């Protein structure tokens, strides 16, 4: 009886030890930078009465480790004519995103041009800033508009 109690006790101790210890490696992040499918997104002839098409580009992590994106920011903020959608979420500022090794992320952009009652074409510009590992990277946004 005493032996079976000791065996049971040791099995509980071993089971507890195995459940507390983990075989999973700690997550380490890459020190690399992002790469992009395009460095400039251009919208050609956007009319003020009609919205633009939605353009997309890809953000790549070419490294063998997960990459932590500290910030993605539409620099014009809420006052920008451009709108962005990152990973299915609309907004102007995104933070603490993780991009797995050899993976990519879609970023969608559209624009609305405000009328100015002029006859000359308008140029609307903004930039998307990416902060990763202390490095700033920019993607330019340019739209040609007309009333």
Label the predicted regions.
Residues 56-58, 106-110, 127-129, 140:
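Beta-strand secondary-structure signal
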Residues 9, 52-54, 125:
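Short beta-strand-initiation
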Residues 24-45, 51-53, 62-115:
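Surface-exposed binding patches on compact interaction domains or structured appendages
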Residues 1-10:
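Bacterial N-terminal signal peptides that target proteins for export
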Residues 115-145:
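Terminal connector regions
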Residues 19-22:
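C-terminal motif of bacterial Sec signal peptides marking the signal peptidase cleavage site
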């Amino acid at each position: 009886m005493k032996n079976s109690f000791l065996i049971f006790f040791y099995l509980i101790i071993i089971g507890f030890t195995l459940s507390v210890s983990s075989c999973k490696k700690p997550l380490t992040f890459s020190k690399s930078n992002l790469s992009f499918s395009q460095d400039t997104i251009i919208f050609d002839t956007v009319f003020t009465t009609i919205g633009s098409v939605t353009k997309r580009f890809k953000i790549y992590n070419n490294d063998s480790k997960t990459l932590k994106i500290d910030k993605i920011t539409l620099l014009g903020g809420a006052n920008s004519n451009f709108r962005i959608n990152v990973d299915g979420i609309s907004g102007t500022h995104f933070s603490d995103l993780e991009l797995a090794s050899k993976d990519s992320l879609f970023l969608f952009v559209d624009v609305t041009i405000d009328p100015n009652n002029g006859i000359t074409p308008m140029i609307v510009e903004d930039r998307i800033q990416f902060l990763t590992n202390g490095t700033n990277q920019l993607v330019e946004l340019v739209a040609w508009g007309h009333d």
